[in-house]
Amino acid sequence: MSNKLTFQEIILTLQQYWNDQGCMLMQAYDNEKGAGTMSPYTFLRAIGPEPWNAAYVEPSRRPADGRYGENPNRLYQHHQFQVVMKPSPSNIQELYLQSLERLGIDPLEHDIRFVEDNWENPSTGSAGLGWEVWLDGMEITQFTYFQQVGGLATSPVTAEVTYGLERLASYIQEVDSVYDIEWAPGVKYGEIFLQPEYEHSKYSFEVSNQDMLLENFETFEKEAERALAQGLVHPAYDYVLKCSHTFNLLDARGAVSVTERAGYIARIRHLARSVAKTFVAERKKLGFPLLDDASRVALLAED
């Protein structure tokens, strides 16, 4: 490709494009999480009747995927560009393809395929109809219409577009290793992230204190429940995220059996569902303030 955008130029281009489509530009949420979907800007805002259009970069940590910086495409932490639009625009796939054009990828000159891959996140009680988007044989995006989030049916339906920024940048810059991606002029991805990749992998697989992590999970779970009992949705959800990341560290360390693993996931799911239900109830008390007046009156009148 002739237009070899840097990593940060890819982000800037996507931000400008989705801003032009009416999305608010949010910032990465300051808690560890395994995917951009787990940000409250997606998880919480995808439920309930209020409209929501947002785009943001989300660093996503997956301890079990760490490879000490030795694998060119497998990472402890990668970056997602997350777009959520609710209600889903009827032309969302067309908007997505136009975003690729902004990045210098002409859909007419490349093999772009939507491969069915329905999505599910057992830890949060979430699922949806989905597709992987393949560009010349490489997955670059996950496309999902949420049907359920936090155990609640979504109405209206939220569309989520999740770009894998490292894969996208590798393709645009024509490099085989993520560590060779140019983040900014003269600065390679590896110069920023290779050492953290090694250290986090070593910590996740060899060094982490299992007893401490087990104790932390119990503490975070109790604190989430305590916050929820006071109607404090956002602090409670922060602790759900902490539970999730702590479990992922335990899983990477091999500290939980297959049976225990299912139990931990069920506990996180129970918390996530409680948070989701409480969030909608709290928004209802506020009169669903993001709805227009006519929709609000009609919705509240139904009750």
From Swiss-Prot:
It is found in: Cytoplasm. GO terms for molecular function: ATP binding; catalytic activity, acting on a protein; glycine-tRNA ligase activity; transferase activity. It comes from the Bacteria. It catalyses: tRNA(Gly) + glycine + ATP = glycyl-tRNA(Gly) + AMP + diphosphate. Keywords: Aminoacyl-tRNA synthetase, ATP-binding, Cytoplasm, Ligase, Nucleotide-binding, Protein biosynthesis. InterPro entries: aa-tRNA-synth_II/BPL/LPL, Gly-tRNA-synth_heterodimer, Gly-tRNA_ligase_asu. One of its GO terms (cellular component) is cytosol. Its main location: cytoplasm. SUPFAM superfamilies: Class II aaRS and biotin synthetases. Belongs to the class-II aminoacyl-tRNA synthetase family. Tetramer of two alpha and two beta subunits. HAMAP family: Gly_tRNA_synth_alpha. This is Glycine--tRNA ligase alpha subunit.
